[in-house]
Regions:
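Active-site hotspot residues in diverse enzymes, especially metal/ion-binding acidic/histidine motifs
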Residues: 1-155
Length: 155
């Protein structure tokens, strides 16, 4: 089962509905959770035929299902609201990266690949997801980066 199929299966298991809608082009996905309706992820129809972009956006929106507290659909009138929104977006993005690229998978692929493009292809993710995963690793898991760097030095 590929990563996108795993995301769809997770949505099914969590009773998250997925809707394809015509959004403004700058909005690619939205997670909606309200007591009166089941959790729903609305994805922009413009990414329907782009498997990697769909996987990236869907993973982040599923990340909101597991990490976001509160409703951010309201207008952000105060600076503290914007800061809180940024933190929630970071949590969802971190969840997405960890779901799509496990630490062991990243380390194993780094050992086998000779280029960034090869690494992206082997991990079956977009450059953006790989970049974010490495950025989050640099903050959270220095041991993983240390192991990757040591391996690269020994090659």
């Amino acid at each position: 089962m590929n990563k996108l199929d795993k995301l769809y299966k997770l949505c099914e298991d969590e009773n998250i509905q997925i809707e394809w809608v015509n959004f403004n082009p700058c909005i690619l996905g939205v997670y909606i959770s309200d007591k009166d309706i089941p959790p729903t992820i609305a994805l922009n129809k413009s990414i329907f035929n782009d498997r990697l972009k769909t996987m990236e956006i869907l993973a982040e929106e599923v990340g909101h299902h597991f990490t976001t507290n509160g409703n951010f659909a309201n207008r952000l009138l105060h600076y503290s609201d914007r800061v809180r929104l940024i933190k929630e977006e970071q949590k969802a993005a971190r969840w997405a990266c960890n779901f799509l690229i496990g630490d062991d998978e990243l380390f194993d692929c780094v050992k086998k690949c000779t280029s960034e493009d090869e690494l992206i292809e082997m991990l079956d993710v977009s450059f953006g997801i790989l970049y974010d995963k490495l950025r989050f690793c640099s903050v959270e898991n220095m041991e993983l980066l240390y192991n990757i760097c040591n391996y690269l030095k020994s090659v």
